[in-house]
Amino acid sequence: ARSRQLLEMIERDYDFLSFSEAAKFMNFSEPYFSRYFKQQAGLSFSRYLNIVRTERALDLIKTDESLTMSEVAKQSGFNTIRNFNRIIKEITGYAPNQLPAGYSLDIRSACVGQEHFDPTLESTVLLPSSD
């Protein structure tokens, strides 16, 4: 139950939530939380948070063409435009300003990235769509 609350909190507070705050929310030490999250989700907390932030950024890019990339970065929780550009390219394969029209994030590919992700793990949690 607490794990589900954490995932809901990440979805809601992605723009300012930190690793330390998430560990504290779970009442875990940071090293234990790191292992726990990776075991439960199949990827690290930071990778998961970056995927959530990337989804938000892509939504903003699609729905509000008046926003600059700096505004999109800030509103989607990235602390610098450089970090925003790096993470978006790492997850999507495209620079934010070079995304193809109608681009849609493939979550499975995003989760794989540089880490092992096995969606068949018993501990893998599917999140409901925020649509």
Residue ranges and their predicted role:
Residues 1-17, 23-26, 47-67:
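A short, Lys/Arg-enriched amphipathic alpha-helix from helix-turn-helix/homeodomain DNA-binding modules
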Residues 16, 20-52, 73-98:
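Basic/polar phosphate-binding segments, predominantly the helix-turn-helix DNA-binding elements
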Residues 62, 75, 86-131:
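…primarily DNA-binding HTH/wHTH and HhH modules…
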